[in-house]
Amino acid sequence: MPKKNKKVNAAILIIGNEILSGRTQDKNVAFISNWLNAKCGISVTEVRIIPDVEKIIIKNIKILSKKFNYVFTTGGIGPTHDDITAKSIAKAFKTKYEFHKEAYQILEKYYGKKNFNDGRKKMAKLPRHSKLIYNPSSAAPGFIIKNVFSYQEYHQF
C-alpha cells in the first residue's frame, strides 16, 4: 500500500539504456511533472533513470510503488528485445505476463494481420489485470496496474 501523506505524491521511473548512454534525450520528466503538478495537484518528489535490466526494474517498482501514491514509468514497452518493462512489472507484482485481449485486437487492427509480427504482438503482452492507457499517437497502448502507470511517451498526450 502506498505511504499515506497529506499531499498526494508520485515518482517517475525512466527506463532505458539509451537515456543513460546519452543516445536519447528524455522528453517525459518535465511533461509528467508539469502535468501532475498543474492539472492534478500531485507532487512529483522523486525521479529515477535506470537501465533495461530486469532485476533493477523489479526492485525499483517494488520500492517506489510502496513509497509513493503513484508511479509513472516510461520506456521499455516497445517491440524490441530490450523492451522488458511490462514483463518486469508483472514479476514485481507477482502476476502473470500474458496477452491482453483488447490490446491484441487494437494492435492487430492497426498493423493489419500481414504486418502484425512477433515484435508487435509482444506489445500486447501485459501484466494480468492491467487496464489499458490508450495511445493517441500510435496503437501501442500503455497500461495501469495497481498504482503504476506505464506508457511509452507521455509527452504525446
Specify the residue positions occupied by each region the protein language model found:
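Glycine- and acidic-residue-enriched helix-capping/strand-helix junction motifs
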Residues: 15, 19-29
